[in-house]
Amino acid sequence: MDEIVKNIREGTHVLLPFYETLPELNLSLGKSPLPSLEYGANYFLQISRVNDLNRMPTDMLKLFTHDIMLPESDLDKVYEILKINSVKYYGRSTKADAVVADLSARNKLFKRERDAIKSNNHLTENNLYISDYKMLTFDVFRPLFDFVNEKYCIIKLPTLFGRGVIDTMRIYCSLFKNVRLLKCVSDSWLKDSAIMVASDVCKKNLDLFMSHVKSVTKSSSWKDVNSVQFSILNDPVDTEFINKFLEFSNRVYEALYYVHSLLYSSMTSDSKSIENKHQRRLVKLLL
């Protein structure tokens, strides 16, 4: 428990290994790989609590998270730490210290207003911006279309779950020699978003990757039609890399399970009020 609290209050990170050789690429747009246990068993424990929250009416979610949904300022914090003075979003600037893509639903918890759902058997979709592997779209590679000679490539990932995000990180670990994942204090600890910071580009591998992508998409520039789910590797990445990734993501999901459990206990408290011991513990933890 002490380690969970420490990660929430101080953040957590991991440095991923560099691979000189790209894995065999086979880009297919339109569908994500399905989840499986080898890509994170903790998710399947954590998703049970997410489903409990997903059943709650959104007006109640807003009430109980109003004071703990602080503005997500993790990207700004990363810019400050790395002394990044200018960033390039989707080609909007010709010269910058970093090229950036934010795939997260910044400062949002749910997708649409909704009443309560009776039981998990009646859940037909994940209405929360939490643990949704379908949120990872091919936009995660969009900065590479705009990358010239920037020092950093920075991605705000919408989730850490699923094969898609691990395959993506494995590719980035051949495109850049330094790839780090961060879950900052100033990110939302209600959601499984995180930041990837990559630097020291491997030009040879980047050229090979972009050649494959452009041949599949039949375009040398980014097209919005590519903003869809995708798969990119036929074969699973090696177990060593998966375990290194899970070393980071498990810390995040353990923390989320604790936070979500407190929130659910607060929302279902006998007091029938936001003034209860679970909410007080939650506020103390996150503020």
UniProtKB/Swiss-Prot annotation:
<keyword id="KW-0806">Transcription termination</keyword>
<comment type="function">
    <text>Regulatory subunit of the mRNA cap enzyme which stabilizes the catalytic subunit and enhances its methyltransferase activity through an allosteric mechanism. Heterodimeric mRNA capping enzyme catalyzes the linkage of a N7-methyl-guanosine moiety to the first transcribed nucleotide (cap 0 structure), whereas the methyltransferase OPG102 is responsible for a second methylation at the 2'-O position of the ribose (cap 1 structure). Also involved in early viral gene transcription termination and intermediate viral gene transcription initiation.</text>
</comment>
<dbReference type="GO" id="GO:0006353">
    <property type="term" value="P:DNA-templated transcription termination"/>
</dbReference>
<keyword id="KW-0506">mRNA capping</keyword>
<comment type="subunit">
    <text>Interacts with the catalytic subunit OPG113.</text>
</comment>
<keyword id="KW-0946">Virion</keyword>
<dbReference type="Pfam" id="PF03341">
    <property type="entry name" value="Pox_mRNA-cap"/>
</dbReference>
<comment type="similarity">
    <text>Belongs to the orthopoxvirus mRNA-capping enzyme regulatory subunit family.</text>
</comment>
<dbReference type="GO" id="GO:0004482">
    <property type="term" value="F:mRNA 5'-cap (guanine-N7-)-methyltransferase activity"/>
</dbReference>
<keyword id="KW-0507">mRNA processing</keyword>
<keyword id="KW-0805">Transcription regulation</keyword>
<dbReference type="InterPro" id="IPR005009">
    <property type="entry name" value="Poxvirus_mRNA-cap_ssu"/>
</dbReference>
<protein>
    <recommendedName>
        <fullName>mRNA-capping enzyme regulatory subunit OPG124</fullName>
    </recommendedName>
</protein>
<dbReference type="GO" id="GO:0044423">
    <property type="term" value="C:virion component"/>
</dbReference>
<keyword id="KW-0804">Transcription</keyword>
<dbReference type="InterPro" id="IPR043096">
    <property type="entry name" value="Poxvirus_mRNA-cap_ssu_sf"/>
</dbReference>
